[in-house]
C-alpha cells in the first residue's frame, strides 16, 4: 500500500465517521459537561488530599 492509497483510505474513513456522527443536543451537552466537571473535581480533591497528607507527614 503506497502513500497515496493510505491517504485516500484515511480520507474515506474520516468522511464515513463524519457522515454518521451528529451534533449533540443541549441535554446531552449539559449531561456530558456535568460528568466532566465532576471528574475534574474528583481529580482535584484527590490531588489536594495527597498534598495535604504529604504536608502533614513532612515530605
UniProtKB/Swiss-Prot annotation:
Keywords, A to Z, come to:
Cell membrane, Membrane, Protein transport, Translocation, Transmembrane, Transmembrane helix, Transport
Topology with respect to the bilayer: Single-pass membrane protein
Q: For this UniProt entry, which segments traverse the membrane?
A: 35-55
Instruction: Answer whether the UniProt record assigns the keyword Nuclease to this protein.
Output: no
Name the source's superkingdom. Archaea
Identify the GO cellular component terms for this protein.
plasma membrane
The record's family statement is: Belongs to the SecE/SEC61-gamma family.
Q: What does this protein do?
A: Essential subunit of the Sec protein translocation channel SecYEG. Clamps together the 2 halves of SecY. May contact the channel plug during translocation.
Which protein is depicted?
Protein translocase subunit SecE
Query: Organism, per UniProt?
Result: Methanobrevibacter smithii (strain ATCC 35061 / DSM 861 / OCM 144 / PS)
Q: Which gene encodes it?
A: secE
Amino acid at each position: 500500500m503506497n502513500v497515496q492509497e493510505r491517504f485516500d483510505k484515511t480520507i474515506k474513513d474520516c468522511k464515513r465517521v463524519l457522515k454518521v456522527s451528529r451534533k449533540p443536543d443541549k441535554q446531552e451537552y449539559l449531561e456530558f459537561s456535568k460528568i466532566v466537571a465532576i471528574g475534574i473535581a474528583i481529580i482535584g480533591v484527590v490531588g489536594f488530599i495527597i498534598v495535604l497528607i504529604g504536608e502533614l507527614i513532612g515530605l
